[in-house]
């Protein structure tokens, strides 16, 4: 089995829901809670991405692998994938090399996106260092703007923000059920 780790390199430049949108939902017409609401938006986006196992607004990720895949396919978590920036590997002597993009094919119209070898190509045969020897850097997300995120996800994030804002002091039983329904809706998309 090929173990992997995912690391955020560059986070999204914007959130899927703006502060002004959230304030309208919350019926807040003052600026006193702006910092809190902005933090709730970020937390809601991160929770939603984790539950849906998707990236909403473009962000750069590093996928670290322990070895080359036996089946010839590298599956990229947290779709959708916009592009693969590079595949870098570290040899036994800790020097790095980058695969030529002509050696592999990135298939982004499937979930999860897949990297496969090009025709008559093979994974590098160099001996690899023992820890995190392979790094795939890629951009994942629906696009660079909040408008590119499907409305379904934006609505669920807005709902998370609303419940969290209203339950700052204490979470009631109806609010807990509402949170669970939102979480279940986000988990429904996870099918890969």
Feature-to-residue mapping (PLM):
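Divalent metal-cofactor coordination and adjacent catalytic microenvironments
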Residues: 1-192
